[in-house]
Amino acid sequence: NHYKRVATDTMDEIEIEKSNMLMIGPTGCGKTYLVKTLAKLLDVPLAIADATSLTEAGYIGDDIESVVSKLLAAADNDVERAEHGIIFIDEIDKIAKKKNTNQRDVSGEAVQQGMLKLLEGSEVEVPVGANSKNAMVPLVTVNTRNILFICGGAFPDLENIIKERLNKQASIGFYADLKDKYDND
């Protein structure tokens, strides 16, 4: 669907919505290998990042925009080629928001917010030929609108989370339990 959308981008009046991918599977099952093979078959540049190494911009570690910089480097600094590449973010399940914490979460929710901007399609300024921003490195603008984002993770507790949600009583709709908050029954 993604590359059909890119190919028909200017030909049709109807725009096909961008669809990124989520791959779920245990560690070592071949998610990364599958993405590498896909990029090779499609002859598009590929950048692979580990979500656990991503942090909010300004902190030690890679920010989410540095992944776009890696993609640009994989495309030999050809912006147009990079804009049709693939970014694979592995271990995405590790950056889930922590419950009931009052501490600054520089590698969880902040990364999620930064990632949403890229996944939906935005323009990002990234350095040419380098992974760090400094005054001496020229910047180019990369539009993420046509970049295919594939995220992968093991999601070990997913089955239990689904069971919990399915077993909950409905709180709205026809099956809602309509008790008054002052009922003691």
Language model features: what each stretch is:
Residues N1-A47, A51-I60, I64-D185:
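AAA+ P-loop NTPase nucleotide-binding core of proteostasis motors
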